[in-house]
């Protein structure tokens, strides 16, 4: 029977008192003080880098964790069709482009008929050094990892099957020394030259540096006419950053889908990402979550 004037039970009274206390505490201290920060609130682009790597990138490129996180998203879309780039430290695959195995964040290669000066050996040498080798070498790293292979001239010849070799690389995904070696090699082979070329022209923006890095790792930093060096030589001499980058992107678009750099039309869409950000005026890649989502919203072929 329902009695509107009945006395509340003791349990109900305790509940009401507890609720009132909770409400008072929440109003005084805030929900965050009671529960701690939410996972979403605690998440920061800086968390995607070790403190050492983050400081290294800041010192040498002038860009912070948020900017590098966005650069890596833009690079990883055409490389892996995925913005979650941190999953690919242990990536390994023979993509049958005659460049050997493709490895890690920036697609280091072991070498082949179309790549006689690969960057893979540098990565393995850096790993051997990071693990404490007194005289680091690519061969030393292979031995350390139990990989059957050796340097043959400038090419890293792997004798294990793809399943065995890539299985061992995938196990390095969370290896701190491997991650350190990955960023050191990435910087030495591609990032340093890209930053130098930007600064020589008076440019320091994240989009310009990122676009140059993307070009270098995709088409080579120096050497032939399709490399970053070759494209820069054909992009004019404008001191206006936007004007220069529009010219640079136009030149890159002409060659980006040739020579197995990308499968058409993925290359054109790759360049368009950066070019659209230039048009948007989002050169510093700060607070651009929606813009990154927009420019990477294209279908890989």
Swiss-Prot record:
Subcellular location per the Swiss-Prot or TrEMBL entry:
Secreted
The reaction(s) catalysed by this protein are: Endohydrolysis of beta-(1->4)-linkages between D-glucosamine residues in a partly acetylated chitosan
Q: Which GO terms describe its molecular function?
A: chitosanase activity
Q: What class of enzyme is it?
A: hydrolase
Gene Ontology BP term (one): carbohydrate metabolic process
Per the UniProt entry, the disulfide pairs are 92-166
Q: Which residues form the active site?
A: 79 (proton donor), 97 (nucleophile)
Disulfide bond as UniProt keyword: yes
The principal location of this protein is secreted
Q: Which residues form the signal peptide?
A: 1-42
For the keyword Cytoplasm, the answer is no
Q: Which UniProt keywords apply?
A: Disulfide bond, Glycosidase, Hydrolase, Secreted, Signal
InterPro entries hit by this protein: Glyco_hydro_46, Glyco_hydro_46_N, Lysozyme-like_dom_sf
- EC code: 3.2.1.132
- Which Pfam family, an example, fits this chain? Glyco_hydro_46
Taken from the UniProt entry, a GO cellular component term is: extracellular region
The similarity comment for this entry is: Belongs to the glycosyl hydrolase 46 family.
What's its job?
Answer: Aids in the defense against invading fungal pathogens by degrading their cell wall chitosan.
Q: What is this protein called?
A: Chitosanase
Name the source organism: Niallia circulans
